[in-house]
């Protein structure tokens, strides 16, 4: 957008000579013409333009009386598309999935009843370091501080409960209830989300969205962020200390962590991998951020449930570089990783810790890796060790005709579907482990929610990711228990012409909970899942459903979904035995159960 600075034309001299007095020889100072406010000069218009400039072209919304006027202004922006969702939780999950692809997402809900419904999704985005802009239509600005009791509140004159909840799961909160500083509040909120890679909360009073104001009268200066820079001396000191440590090591390795995304350092990480010759592994939540066709890629490091032979190489190394790791009870398999801090170089997005010793701050991850790549001594010892012990993975037995389908046989066929034109969304549960074993072709997307692990996340995330990346076909793997939490927004996928392939794995319960701690509460009511989706479809839009029980039926379903139904949303219910789980889930579940069951420390 062009930026117009001031009413310059109104200040020109009345003669043609620059700097000369007017022809009547009396010099006068003329005021700039007053700014005229129009329907273009509104808060809603400013917010919509800012969203587009930040990279958002779709917002996920649920209407409510406090946000209706704001939604009018958002849909009036020609470059912004409104995606109406069935509930606020899914709108938040969709913004999460969208941010994973686009780098930023946005959702719009109404005050408190909508805000507290979307809160769980925003907490998940916070845990996963995703910049999601959560916009809430708030009460009329005249109601603040009046002791009035409003609807959509808990019935107290103080209606700040929503704000206080969001303060714990967002990095910035803007309550816009006057127009004087609204411009600054909105800009600061969006800038903070992008800088911190965390969600922000913006509440906009319902009577302000359409109100013209001089601060919005001109197109804003195009949105931009000042690039962050490393401290030169700190960078040099960090590189020197790291080189001294690495050059003494015999068999160093590299492990990519999920904060590679936050730091935007995947390319720099690969530059170091190319230069060093070290084996290259990823933590489970990093899958998809590092190309698996790299010549030194050895798989997923996940402790006892790692890719075969990966943990042996990582845990036997005498030096490991971890790039943006997150160590929690899930990623550490119940705190059972065999790692030593004194062997680790931990590279955070903005600091480096060398061998549990000195910390070097104000050092950006990408700068650090690029500088290290220029000077590191090549050492392929650990990768050579990997090649010596590596044995190709066996293939599962093929199902006999009429034999019930096994999950491991199913994923052999899923592997053949993957390409640079697909993306994988893995729901919390056994899909985590089965999808981790897929070998991703270059350019194939991959997402799952490792830190927060909220079941049902994948339905909304599939909606958002597919909307952000229409050129890819999303393959989504969802358990029946998870699907029952958020099933409604299949409707939104159909409504918006999406063409994802959803594999609903029906094993009759919450399988991941079964393997941690079993009980009757983990058994769920079986649904007619294809019948449900057919009812949601209701003949409007393109949708195809099928049930499969045998391998030959799965092969036929995949063929149909990828040929004659390639332009439709495809829903494939895969019916498997309730005890058909991956060996990795069995191992992981027992270790997490042991961690959960630790007795209290003695007092």
From Swiss-Prot:
InterPro entries referenced in this protein's UniProt entry, alphabetically: DHS-like_NAD/FAD-binding_dom, PDC/IPDC-like, THDP-binding, Thiamin_PyroP_enz_cen_dom, Thiamin_PyroP_enz_TPP-bd_dom, TPP-bd_CS, TPP_enzyme_TPP-bd, TPP_PDC_IPDC
Pfam families documented for this protein: TPP_enzyme_C, TPP_enzyme_M, TPP_enzyme_N
Residues binding Mg(2+), per UniProt: 480, 507, 509
Ranges for region Thiamine pyrophosphate binding: 430-512
Membrane-crossing segments per the record: none
Record's keyword annotation contains Transcription regulation: no
Tissue-by-tissue expression: Expressed in shoots and at lowe levels in roots, flowers and siliques.
Catalytic activity, EC: 4.1.1.1
Binding-site residues for substrate, renumbered to this chain: 65, 152, 513
Induction: By abscisic acid (ABA), salt and osmotic stress. Not induced by anoxia.
GO molecular function, one term: pyruvate decarboxylase activity
Subunit structure, interactors included: Homotetramer.
Full protein name: Pyruvate decarboxylase 4
Organism of this sequence: Arabidopsis thaliana (Mouse-ear cress)
């Amino acid at each position: 957008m062009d930026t117009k600075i001031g009413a310059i034309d109104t200040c020109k001299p009345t003669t043609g000579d620059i700097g000369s007095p007017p022809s009547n020889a009396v010099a006068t100072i003329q005021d700039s013409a007053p700014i005229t406010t129009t329907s273009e000069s509104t808060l809603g218009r400013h917010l919509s333009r800012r969203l587009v400039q930040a990279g958002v072209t779709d917002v996920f919304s649920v209407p409510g009386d406090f946000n209706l006027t704001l939604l009018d202004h958002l849909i009036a922006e020609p470059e912004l598309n409104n995606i109406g969702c069935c509930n606020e939780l899914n709108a938040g999950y969709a913004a999460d999935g969208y941010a994973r692809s686009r780098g930023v997402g946005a959702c719009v809900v109404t005050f408190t009843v909508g805000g507290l419904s979307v809160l769980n999704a925003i907490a998940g985005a916070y845990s996963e370091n995703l910049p999601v802009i959560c916009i809430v239509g708030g009460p009329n600005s005249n109601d603040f501080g009046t002791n009035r009791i409003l609807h959509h509140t808990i019935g107290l004159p103080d209606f700040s409960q929503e704000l206080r909840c969001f303060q714990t799961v967002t990095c910035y909160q803007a309550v816009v209830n006057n127009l004087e500083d609204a411009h600054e509040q909105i800009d600061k909120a969006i800038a903070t989300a992008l800088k911190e890679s965390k969600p922000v909360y913006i509440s906009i009073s319902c009577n302000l969205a359409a109100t013209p104001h001089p601060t919005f009268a001109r197109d804003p200066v195009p949105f931009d962020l000042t690039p962050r820079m490393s401290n030169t001396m700190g960078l040099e000191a960090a590189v020197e200390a790291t080189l001294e440590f690495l050059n003494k090591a015999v068999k160093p390795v590299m492990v990519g962590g999920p904060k590679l995304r936050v730091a935007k350092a995947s390319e720099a990480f690969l530059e170091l991998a190319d230069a060093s010759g070290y084996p290259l592994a990823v933590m489970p939540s990093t899958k998809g951020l590092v190309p698996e066709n790299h010549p030194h890629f050895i798989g997923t490091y996940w402790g006892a449930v790692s890719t075969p032979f990966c943990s042996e190489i990582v845990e036997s190394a005498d030096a490991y570089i971890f790039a943006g790791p997150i160590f929690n009870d899930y990623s550490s398999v119940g705190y059972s990783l065999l790692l030593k801090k004194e062997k680790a170089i931990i590279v955070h997005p903005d600091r480096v810790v060398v061998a549990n010793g000195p910390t070097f701050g104000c050092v950006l991850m990408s700068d650090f890796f690029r500088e290290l790549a220029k000077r590191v001594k090549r050492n392929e010892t650990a990768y050579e060790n990997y090649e010596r012990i590596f044995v190709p993975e066996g293939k599962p037995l093929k199902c006999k005709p009429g034999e019930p389908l096994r999950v491991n046989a199913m994923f052999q066929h899923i592997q053949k579907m993957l390409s640079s034109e697909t993306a994988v969304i893995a729901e919390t549960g056994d899909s985590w482990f089965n999808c981790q074993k897929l070998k991703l072709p270059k350019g194939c997307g991959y997402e799952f929610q490792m830190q927060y692990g909220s079941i049902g996340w994948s339905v909304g995330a599939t909606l958002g990711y597919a909307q952000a990346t229409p050129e890819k076909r999303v393959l989504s793997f969802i358990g029946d228990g998870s699907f029952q939490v958020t099933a409604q927004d299949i409707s939104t996928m159909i409504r918006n012409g999406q063409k994802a392939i959803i594999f609903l794995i029906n094993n009759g319960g919450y399988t991941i909970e079964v393997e941690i701690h079993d009980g009757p509460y983990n058994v769920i009511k079986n649904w007619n899942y294809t019948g449900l989706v057919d009812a949601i479809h209701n003949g409007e839009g393109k949708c195809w459903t099928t049930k499969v029980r045998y391998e030959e039926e799965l092969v036929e379903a995949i063929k149909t979904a990828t040929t004659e139904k390639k332009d439709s949303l495809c829903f494939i219910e895969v019916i498997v035995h309730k005890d058909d789980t991956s060996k990795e889930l069995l191992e992981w579940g027992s270790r997490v159960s042991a961690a959960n069951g630790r007795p209290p420390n003695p007092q």
